[in-house]
Amino acid sequence: YLLLLCLPLTLMGTGAVPPGPSIEIHPRIVGGWECDKHSQPWQALLTFTNGLDGVCGGVLVHPQWVLTAAHCIGDNYKIKLGLHDRFSKDDPFQEFQVSASFPHPSYNMRLLKLLLSDEMNDTYYYEIFPGADFSHDLMMMQLEKPVQLNDAVQVLDLPTQEPQVGSKCHASGWGSMDPYSRNFPRTGKLQCVDLTLMSNNECSRSHIFKITDDMLCAGHIKGRKDTCGGDSGGPLICDGVFQGTTSWGSYPCGKPRMPGVYVKIFSHVDWIREIIATHS
């Protein structure tokens, strides 16, 4: 979840935050509840290094492929599936190394690197942020071997049509539950939150980043419920259909009239299938 208000930290979730409007790249679950165990069997936990330790979510879209956020780029990837309590030694899960990763070619990786660089200063921050476009925030991760499908590990089907504004959705992840935390503490047990799909026009009036047709916005007018730091790449499921992955949002998470922003999966189905077909 990329925080629009605290960009330099958003990927790793620690460090100083520049003054002014924020944008967060790693959403976390705020105002939700503990998911029923293994009720989200497609949910993946991605850990990696990128100067600091990173945590993201992901979605199993094929027995050997996990979809996550492009801004979760790093090294030494490990992916866990079938997990509920990430701190429990007794929780059975499957763990995999990543043999190859494929960020979406249209994602603005150069801008992301600038936002996370030591060279960023307040002046440059305000010059570059308004209207910045973080579309196509997706990355495909090829596992070293196929998963073993069971009650706790299942593939989530890709959508066949776009969701409608007003759809009832839910998101899930192990991200922080504190909307004001600058250190992004993460929860141990998988959290779920209910959200409502909002119009992109309404969303664009709330955020300084560009809202495109390849994005979805979900939240609540009154706020209080949101994804947040550590939830990036996790699923947004609307009316029972996989429609989005967590991308970015405001700081603090869960602000009124500031919905979280998600990648519209329907716009990227062909790319996802092409990656799987070409590299499997």
Swiss-Prot record:
Known tissue expression: Salivary glands.
Disulfide bridge map: C35-C192, C56-C72, C169-C238, C203-C217, C228-C253
Signal peptide span: 1-16
Entry keyword annotation includes Signal: yes
InterPro entries: Peptidase_S1_PA, Peptidase_S1_PA_chymotrypsin, Peptidase_S1A, Trypsin_dom, TRYPSIN_HIS, TRYPSIN_SER
GO MF term list: serine-type endopeptidase activity
Chief subcellular location: secreted
Compartment(s) where it occurs, according to its Swiss-Prot or TrEMBL record: Secreted
Superkingdom, natural source: Eukaryota
CDD domains in the cross-refs: Tryp_SPc (cd00190)
SMART domains: Tryp_SPc
Glycosylation sites: S99, N121
Record key words, sorted: Disulfide bond, Glycoprotein, Hydrolase, Protease, Secreted, Serine protease, Signal, Zymogen
Keyword Cell cycle: no
Gene Ontology annotations of biological process type: regulation of systemic arterial blood pressure; zymogen activation
Cellular component terms per the entry's GO annotation: extracellular region; secretory granule
Record EC number: 3.4.21.-
Proregion positions: 17-28
Protein family: Belongs to the peptidase S1 family. Kallikrein subfamily.
Role of this protein: A kallikrein-like protease. It preferentially converts human high-molecular-weight kininogen (HK) to bradykinin. Is not toxic to mice.
Protein name, as recorded: Blarinasin-2
Naturally occurring in which organism (per UniProt): Blarina brevicauda (Northern short-tailed shrew)
